[in-house]
Amino acid sequence: MVENEIAMNVKRFFVAFAALIVTWSVSYADGFRVEWKRTAMDRSRTGVTVASADNVKEAMGEVRCGKYYAPNGKVFRKGVTKKVASVMIGAQPKMADVKQIVAYSTSHMVSHAPESALSDWFIDLLISKCSELTGKRVDVGFANFGGIRVEMPAGDVLLDDILSMFPFKNKLCYLELKGRDIRVILQQMASEGWQVIGGVRCVADKAGNLVSAEIGGEPLDDEKVYGVTTVDFLLDGGDGFHISRNALDVQILDKYVIDVVLPHVKSLTAEGKPIEYQVDGRVKIVK
């Protein structure tokens, strides 16, 4: 009976206890989709915030002598709040690894179409790392907004933040495409919805027509061969894209996205540098 009571009240408890909740999103081949987003929660009942590895007591309170002492000073002697607090606080030592601070971000960055600081930072990093790993020139990058699952917080960035941001087993890829095939991809984005792009500057109208595209400061050349990076999810059907169609070369690298992003943010920290980025107007929508 007690276990059933706890299970039935966990959701209600989180509204009072948690600083935020993360809802997972999964896409299936039949089109069924569950959205994944962060939602700010009311923590007025307990004052709980998200704990890092070294501030569990300050962030979540403590259970002592059969009572739960919440961060806001309230004391709970019984009830589901005390019971779930005991479970959550007791689990924190096992979560210590993902609560490590791995970076510092100068601003809160979100991911949204047609472009955003977080998505620009992400795809430009993939372009740089793909070139480094392959030794080839990479002119253009494509990714999907759905592959960036949560926002970049301002201030301390936890390992958990980065792992939650890029949770999918998407591998980095290198392709060679003619300009005309890149134009087809960009036109699809202009008409169906922009995804993450790098190395290219586009102008589109509100009717969904690609007006112009430049790569390296030059107009997109339909006959020129360009180096392209993307993730394997988008090669043949993911989110409706077939980026490998007509490719002259396709290499699926032995690197997951997280294996590119995480070492990079750790190296920034080791060098005393923060994560910081700004949009640069790579996608412009005109009337």
Explain the meaning of each model-derived region.
Residues 95-113, 241-247:
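Acidic/histidine-rich, surface-exposed loop or edge segments in extracytoplasmic proteins
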Residues 79-105:
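N-terminal, Lys/Arg- and Ser/Thr-rich interaction peptides
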Residues 25-29:
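Sec/Tat signal peptide C-region and signal peptidase I cleavage site
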Residues 16-24:
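Bacterial N-terminal signal peptides
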Residues 5-15:
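Bacterial N-terminal signal peptides that target proteins for export
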Residues 31-73, 116, 120-287:
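Feature captures C-terminal
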Residues 92-100, 109, 155-156, 160, ...:
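Membrane-targeting and insertion segments and their boundary/processing signals
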